[in-house]
Amino acid sequence: MSAEVTLHDNIHYDLSADCQHCFGLCCVALPYAKSADFAFDKDGGTPCRNLQSNYQCSIHKDLREKGFRGCSAYECFGAGQKVSQITYEGKDWRNSPETANQMFDVFPIMQQLHEMLWYLHEALSIDIAKPIHSELRTTFEKIERLTRLSKERLLTLQVDEHRAEVNEWLLKTSELVRAQARHPKLPKKVSRGSVLIGAKLKGLDLRGANLRGALLIAADLRNADLRMTDFIGADMRDADLSGADLTGSIFLTQAQVNAANGDSNTKLPLSVRTPAHWK
């Protein structure tokens, strides 16, 4: 892969969370239930009890230890600061309470649009996908324009229709990338949408596998070769990636990596960083 694509100067900033410029939207707008990922129940539109008056989290450095693994794994792809600073022009929901409910409805729509942009941006950085870069760029610019619509128009968007269009080009990108892998004889159970909860996949050659939407919860992927593998939408909570090689894998988000376990020997693509909780 290369990082040659610069659709505008702040692309990397725009597509990653900047909590300092957000009104704590993920901590308010989104609901969650008490579980292994969250320490207590919270309704959508209700501020988390850990959200401070400055919109920062009081336990941010200790989220996993305090029972909020779900928060540590969440990624808004920059939607939070876009809604806070651009869509609502810096007017926060506490000082402008009449905007609160609408803002909380706009945020998840923006998050989905920014997620699409993140995937498209990655596709545009892949040299092997150059034959379709023109179409990818056109699609990126179309979705990016949607993110700058008014709050009223954002609420009327048919997000699923736009996601279907984006997915068409992401699928083509995936096919181009995975075709470059030496195709080993993959286990039959390893395929798109596979249920691989707790699966024993240690040390397997899974290069070029299509793991789109696969359930990899607590899967043992230690020392597995996962190069040029498509991870889009895969649930990787508690998957063990210790010693695994994921270089050249595609559509692997920081949220997925944060939800998994690994170690200093895990090789990750350049688009994500090693989580602090990995040993």
From Swiss-Prot:
<protein>
    <recommendedName>
        <fullName>Uncharacterized protein YybG</fullName>
    </recommendedName>
</protein>
<dbReference type="InterPro" id="IPR051082">
    <property type="entry name" value="Pentapeptide-BTB/POZ_domain"/>
</dbReference>
<dbReference type="Pfam" id="PF00805">
    <property type="entry name" value="Pentapeptide"/>
</dbReference>
<dbReference type="InterPro" id="IPR001646">
    <property type="entry name" value="5peptide_repeat"/>
</dbReference>
